[in-house]
């Protein structure tokens, strides 16, 4: 994938995909084999680790949707973006900020996630 915006959109599509084989196919498309994902709650390596993390988030926040919260800013194989998790109408329940490293093959090799707004008890 050459377009960073499209890459990030596809990455978020993986977080919204509830069918495991389809989600795994999207992750293979957008992540390197050994991609690392780290946020305040989890640190995993590889697509299987992120797939399990996504499944757990979907179980906790069923029915909610990830969306871009603004523009994607990118340079030198690095991109940053804000994302929202919510119902699609009204204020999002969770707001986060991710920084991704993009490998030479155009796929994401690392995600560093930050949680800006989270519900109590998460």
Kindly give the residue locations of the regions a language model identified.
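Basic/polar N-terminal segments that are highly enriched at the extreme N-terminus
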Residues: 1-6, 118-122
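Short, aromatic-enriched amphipathic alpha-helices that serve as compact interaction elements
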Residues: 2-19
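A solvent-exposed, acidic/Ser-Thr-rich amphipathic alpha-helical stretch
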Residues: 5, 22-25, 29-77
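Conserved N-terminal glycine/acidic-rich loop preference
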Residues: 11-15, 27, 31, 35, ...
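Generic secondary-structure transition motif, activating predominantly at the C-termini of alpha-helices
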Residues: 12, 16, 31, 58, ...
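A beta-strand edge to alpha-helix "cap/lid" segment located at domain peripheries
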Residues: 57-122
């Amino acid at each position: 994938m050459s377009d960073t915006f499209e890459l990030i959109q596809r990455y978020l599509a993986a977080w919204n995909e509830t069918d495991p084989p389809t989600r795994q196919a999207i992750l293979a498309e957008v992540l390197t084999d050994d991609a690392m994902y780290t946020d305040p709650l989890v640190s995993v390596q590889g697509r299987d680790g992120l797939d399990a993390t996504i499944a757990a988030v979907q179980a906790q926040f069923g029915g909610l949707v990830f969306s871009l919260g603004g523009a994607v800013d990118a340079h030198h194989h690095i991109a940053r973006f804000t994302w929202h998790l919510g119902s699609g109408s009204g204020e999002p329940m969770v707001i986060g900020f991710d920084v991704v490293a993009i490998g030479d093959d155009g796929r994401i090799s690392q995600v560093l996630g930050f949680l800006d707004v989270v519900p109590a008890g998460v």
